[in-house]
């Protein structure tokens, strides 16, 4: 079986003008490959996905899009370590400062690495330094890893991703994140807050990483709950309750005029302190001398010798650098809009492996390709496989079909054939199943029944990580108006139960679960307070009225609608409701007709007006009537 091989003249772009060849912007050219064979609306997707990629320790991709030099020239490098260019003959020197461990807007690490050595000759346009996401001036924000498109025990269902533990242990997708925390000193009625190391009721072991001023030392290791900046706030002892004063006497502690208001490391933090910025403002306090010389005395005079410097509230920014390894729940993506969540990390010995013994790094779902019509990822992994065994790198234009029909397919197959011929590995290209390989199960070393598409793909790690998403709450702050838990992870909020979620629970008939979620777990103030007591005393848990329903009643009353809740007693009864345990003496039908019914309704409404306050009741009685 023969394959059409693209000649080098097809990929020789020097014969044509770069303006005629450049269809996309330089930014988009760095991302998209094989655009011609994609769905026409799909090329916009990877552009947004790659903006959220996290800089890891990256290798250069095996192949990247062709970007023409006319639009890719590096004109200047202004960036943290100092370069000095010049010789003894030329005494003028130019210095560029390179950034080291600088925080980005996405809390990732920005760093510049020198690309030249001392003594190298550089000219205009030469690269001086690489960033955290480039190698040799080319975009490199991911890793070349072995990818297999096959189902595996349902763990890659619905765009889930199965990865090899090698990616975790060898820090292939380990990234550095820098977070900034701020603390300020304010002026209170009792005086200024102070940044200090002397914090009341704190042992020496808890402040051993603080310096003399009460700020964590640069390079110190901090974990959850550790003090980052020691701060005390003036406190009025008179505001203590008698119970609190009694506790001080029981534990033989002196009443302190200050309280601890230090900045502590938040939940889940394990990081190093890398930088501290202190911002303070001072002003001159003018002291005046005044003499009373009687009527017509001059205004008081300012004396420069007695003017003093007064410190204003200061701001302290502390930066923590944290290493994050790949874990279950993190998000990964390719360069073709193919993204997913890590569902399981398998041991190396359980992963499928190639005929030469190389274990697969990532297992993707093959159903994610045909429906989205991003076939370019298949071409990418096959060309990457050929480039791995040939030791080559490729520049691929996004619209290469102009050079012939099936130009991309022909070029990929030709490179696979060349790799098979040079290495002698016949499994790289099977004439009966081109582009597919026989894989072996790592658990029992048996061959899979069907051939599998395997290749080398360039996979990225995105900024959407499970450490920033995971959240749980038992109790916490509530809204003042609706008495419902707040929303959001930053506010220690609760899980939102929307309208459609309520419908889903109703559809399964989980009545008691739904009643708890809408009352004591949400905004039933009385039920929340009595829940623990009823559980201890083994009593029935009573469900009260949601506070949001009471707010709705009040809002309707503000619109001049006479809506209220009434108490059930012998004198009054609620219209339209049948009393439990009693026979209905009135025939209230759908049209509410009849003279007798109208008279009784008028009598009931008159009785309600006469008894205004005693007849207001709780909502649970109304629910019983309903």
Swiss-Prot record:
The answer to whether the entry has keyword Nucleotidyltransferase is yes
Q: Which Pfam families match?
A: RNA_pol_Rpb2_6, RNA_pol_Rpb2_7
GO process terms (BP): DNA-templated transcription
MF-aspect GO terms: DNA binding; DNA-directed RNA polymerase activity; ribonucleoside binding
**Which subcellular locations apply to this protein?**
Plastid, Chloroplast
Check the record and name the SUPFAM superfamilies matching this protein.
Answer: beta and beta-prime subunits of DNA dependent RNA-polymerase (SSF64484)
What reaction does this enzyme carry out catalytically?
Answer: RNA(n) + a ribonucleoside 5'-triphosphate = RNA(n+1) + diphosphate
Under Enzyme Commission nomenclature, its number is 2.7.7.6
Q: What is its main location?
A: plastid
For the keyword Cell membrane, the answer is no
Q: Tell me the enzyme class.
A: transferase
**Positions of the region Disordered?**
287-307
- Which terms are listed as keywords in the entry? Chloroplast, DNA-directed RNA polymerase, Nucleotidyltransferase, Plastid, Transcription, Transferase
Name residues in a coiled coil: none
Q: Name one GO cellular component term.
A: mitochondrion
InterPro entries hit by this protein: DNA-dir_RNA_pol_su2 (IPR015712), DNA-dir_RNAP_su2_dom (IPR007120), DNA-dir_RNAP_su2_hyb_sf (IPR037033), RNA_pol_bsu_CS (IPR007121), RNA_pol_Rpb2_7 (IPR007641), RNA_pol_RPB2_OB-fold (IPR014724)
Further comment found in the protein's record? In C.reinhardtii the gene for this protein is split in two.
Q: How does it assemble?
A: In plastids the minimal PEP RNA polymerase catalytic core is composed of four subunits: alpha, beta, beta', and beta''. When a (nuclear-encoded) sigma factor is associated with the core the holoenzyme is formed, which can initiate transcription.
The task this protein performs is described as: DNA-dependent RNA polymerase catalyzes the transcription of DNA into RNA using the four ribonucleoside triphosphates as substrates.
Q: Which family does it belong to?
A: Belongs to the RNA polymerase beta chain family.
Protein name, as recorded: DNA-directed RNA polymerase subunit beta C-terminal section
**Organism phylogeny:** Eukaryota, Viridiplantae, Chlorophyta, core chlorophytes, Chlorophyceae
């Amino acid at each position: 079986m023969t394959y059409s091989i693209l000649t080098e003249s097809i990929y020789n772009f020097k014969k044509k003008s770069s303006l005629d060849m450049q269809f996309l912007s330089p930014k988009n050219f760095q991302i998209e490959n094989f655009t011609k064979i994609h769905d026409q609306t799909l090329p916009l997707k990877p552009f947004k996905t790659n903006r959220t990629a996290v800089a890891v320790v990256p290798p250069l991709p095996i192949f990247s899009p062709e970007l023409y030099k006319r639009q890719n020239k590096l004109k200047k490098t202004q960036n943290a370590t100092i370069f000095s260019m010049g010789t003894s003959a030329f005494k003028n020197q130019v210095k560029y400062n390179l950034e080291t461990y600088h925080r980005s807007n996405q809390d990732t690490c920005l760093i510049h690495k020198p690309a030249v050595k001392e003594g190298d000759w550089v000219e205009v346009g030469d690269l001086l330094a690489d960033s955290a996401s480039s190698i040799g001036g080319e975009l490199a924000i991911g890793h070349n890893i072995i990818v297999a498109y096959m189902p595996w025990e349902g763990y890659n269902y619905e765009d889930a991703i199965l990865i090899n533990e090698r990616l975790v242990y060898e820090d292939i997708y380990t990234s550095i994140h820098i977070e900034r925390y701020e603390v300020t000193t304010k002026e209170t009625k009792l005086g200024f807050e102070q940044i200090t190391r002397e914090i009341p009721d704190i042992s020496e072991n808890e402040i051993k990483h603080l310096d003399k001023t009460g700020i964590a030392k640069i390079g110190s290791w901090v974990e959850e709950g550790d003090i980052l900046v020691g701060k005390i706030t003036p406190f009025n002892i008179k505001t203590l309750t008698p119970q609190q004063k009694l506790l001080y006497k029981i534990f033989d502690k002196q009443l302190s005029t200050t309280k601890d208001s230090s900045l502590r490391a938040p939940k889940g933090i394990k990081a190093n302190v890398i930088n501290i910025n202190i911002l303070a403002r001072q002003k001159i306090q003018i002291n005046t001398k005044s003499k009373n010389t009687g009527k017509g005395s001059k205004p008081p005079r300012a004396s420069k010798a007695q003017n003093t410097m007064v410190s204003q509230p200061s701001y302290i920014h502390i930066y923590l650098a944290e290493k994050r390894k790949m874990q279950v729940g993190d998000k990964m993506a390719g360069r073709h809009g193919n993204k997913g969540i890590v569902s399981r990390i398998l041991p190396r010995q359980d992963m499928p492996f190639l005929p030469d013994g190389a274990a697969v790094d990532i297992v993707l779902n093959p159903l994610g390709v045909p429906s989205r019509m991003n076939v370019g990822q298949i071409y990418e992994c096959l060309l990457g496989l050929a480039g791995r065994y040939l030791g080559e790198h490729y520049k691929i234009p996004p619209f290469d079909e102009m050079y012939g029909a099936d130009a991309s397919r022909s070029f990929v197959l030709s490179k696979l054939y060349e790799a098979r011929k040079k290495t002698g590995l016949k499994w790289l290209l099977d004439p009966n199943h081109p582009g597919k390989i026989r894989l072996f199960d790592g658990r029992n070393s048996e061959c899979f029944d069907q051939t599998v598409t395997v290749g080398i793909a360039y996979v990225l790690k995105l900024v959407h990580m499970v450490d920033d998403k995971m959240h749980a709450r038992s109790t916490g702050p509530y809204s003042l108006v609706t008495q419902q838990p707040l929303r959001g992870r930053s506010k220690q909020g609760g899980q939102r139960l929307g309208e459609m979620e309520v419908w889903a629970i109703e559809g399964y008939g989980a009545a008691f679960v739904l009643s708890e979620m809408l009352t004591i777990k949400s905004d039933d103030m009385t039920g929340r307070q009595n829940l623990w007591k009823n559980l201890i005393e083994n009593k029935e848990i009573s469900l009260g009225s949601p506070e949001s329903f009471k707010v709705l009643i009040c809002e309707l009353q503000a619109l001049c609608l006479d809506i209220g809740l009434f108490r059930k007693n012998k004198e009054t009864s609620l219209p339209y409701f049948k009393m439990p345990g009693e026979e209905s003496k009135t025939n209230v039908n759908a049209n509410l007709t009849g003279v007798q019914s109208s008279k009784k309704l008028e009598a009931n409404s008159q009785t309600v007006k006469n008894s205004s306050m005693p007849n207001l009741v709780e909502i649970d009685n109304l629910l019983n009537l309903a």
